[in-house]
Amino acid sequence: NSARADLCVALAKHTGMSPERMMVADVFSHRFYKIYQLEESLSSILDRDDIFIYEVSGRSAIGENSREDVVLPIYLRERTPARDYNNSYYGLMLFGHPLLVSVPRDRLSWDALYHILLYRLSRYVTRPSSDDEDDGDEKDIEDKDNIPKPGHVAGASSQDSGAGSGGAQLWSRRRKPAPVDNSPGPSHWPQRARRKHLFTLQTVNSNGTSDRSTFNEDTHAQPYIAIDWEPEMKKRYYDEVEAEGYVKHDCVGYVLKKAPVRLQECIELFTTVETLEKENPWFCPTCKQHQLATKKLDLWMLPETLIIHLKRFSYTKFSREKLDTLVEFPIRDLDFSEFVIKPQNESAPELYKYDLIAVSNHYGGLRDGHYTTFACNKDSGQSDYFDDNSVSPVTENQIESKAAYVLFYQRQDVARRLQPQPSSSDPPASPACGSPPNSEFMDVN
């Protein structure tokens, strides 16, 4: 259960960077999904997550900016044709990797920020030549709106414009407002400010859009800045190959096979104390305020028939996906005795043990799919595979698969009570597992 600080200290040994200048962020779909604070736990990071480490000047925390520096999250966007809204918002589509840029507090003007970002992007952005500058001067003299005014994006709709309070001030804090750029307007700026600008700047929310409905009601919230490129300018000056390139470390070549998860581990996690994150606080009925808290679920009594629903779908702010992790579950003797906080009868262990009687499988994705079932005949003990109108016998080692979605267990004392008593004339019962099914009717891969 390491914190961000532990990760930064470990990385400092390999990189020589100061851990105080590191910031850790979870990046998904060209956005910051989460920016980790100094003592925040990293336990929520999954194997499939893309974790970025940034080096910034000053103190390395979004919410703990020094008096001299402000750390700004920066997104890259490209204007798309108005008819293409499949992956864009108001004709602006995110691309590339987001940035965290430390900006001196006394340089919080749009013109200064433009040149700071141009410098930060210098590894993969070509500066205009003198001829380009001359061409840009002629065009900008005719159309001064091309200069990156505070919060303005040329050609954007009124909904996507930064006009108003969202674009007039780059940074404000509840305790002490930062200086606001009160420099003269574009018509009074020196001639160099009317040179050809490669991109424009826009205040956005954490999703990378300017939709006011998704802004936090707190006007002092952390600002995000978008660098908006016109397609022709991006193609001409932005080296996308260089920007997406990276040095592959030797350890990256070893792809670990996704380890299966035991059902017992899932139950342990289900009953473990959970610390609620800041984004999911608990509402206290006494003080009527949201508070940081812990949560724990316990088992008080056990039912005769236990239904376990495996979490097969993952939902985040930006995506939904199907989880295909193999969960290993026992066919018999699933023991819950250690998870019950009020034992009913310690001398009767069958009150806490379960045997599997059925499994519901799901194939497909979130929007559509196909369901099949494994079920055990209570009289014969034979397990069968049900797929629409076909039924096939299966062996126990065929029941466990990545498609398992809902597990049905029966308590052992109930199973014994319901089991028919064979007479002396009855033939012996069939074994618990039959012969393998015909492959023509069954597919459990």
From Swiss-Prot:
GO CC aspect terms: chromosome; cytoplasm; nucleus
Annotated positions of the Phosphoserine modification: S130, S430
Any Pfam family: UCH
EC number: 3.4.19.12
Reaction catalyzed: Thiol-dependent hydrolysis of ester, thioester, amide, peptide and isopeptide bonds formed by the C-terminal Gly of ubiquitin (a 76-residue protein attached to proteins as an intracellular targeting signal)
CDD domains in the cross-refs: Peptidase_C19R (cd02674)
SUPFAM superfamilies assigned: Cysteine proteinases
Biased composition (Low complexity): 420-439
Subcellular location: Nucleus; Cytoplasm; Chromosome
Keyword Glycoprotein: no
Residue stretches of biased makeup (Acidic residues): 131-140
PROSITE patterns per the UniProt record, alphabetical: USP_2 (PS00973), USP_3 (PS50235)
Active site residues according to the UniProt entry: H362, H370
Main location, first listed in the record: nucleus
Family: Belongs to the peptidase C19 family.
Subunit structure: Monomer. Interacts with RANBP9/RANBPM. Interacts with BRCA2. Interacts with CHUK/IKKA. Interacts with NFKBIA. Associated component of the Polycomb group (PcG) multiprotein PRC1-like complex.
Protein name as catalogued: Ubiquitin carboxyl-terminal hydrolase 11
Native organism: Canis lupus familiaris
Encoding gene, per UniProt annotation: USP11
